[in-house]
Amino acid sequence: MIPISTAMWDPKWFHDFKSNDFNFIDKNGVINGLRSELFVPDKQYDCGTDLCKEKDKVTDIPNCKFMNEYYSKLNSTTLEGKINELGRICKNAQGRLGFKEESIAVLIVFEVVENMCSERQIIQKYFNENGVDCKELAYPIKENY
């Protein structure tokens, strides 16, 4: 599994407290710091929990401006382009890590599952509507994959 961030703002630990283009292999052998800009929300729609103008007004995703704009962004590039991008990132990581097993792209969204203001639901919707099964990672990982 290759973790790939979709976040506008990654947590600092994801880049070992260095720049956003820094990636590294942690003590568990997991590569951290990989990103795909095809999935990163545009910064002009950065609303976050504290900045959300719709907080407590909008309780469903279809009426949230951020979610609508993010869904439009995903639809502005082809599914094939996204699959190719994820494949390229995984192939590079696979070579760097030196494993021969098939790599699986795991899109990382840093909000908790319960947070309705999260790209995770829009990413899942986009892939599922385009015939690609996309669901939440099941834990514990070792027992499920």
Q: What kind of feature is each model-predicted range?
A:
Residues 1-145:
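Residues lining hydrophobic/aromatic ligand-binding pockets adjacent to catalytic sites
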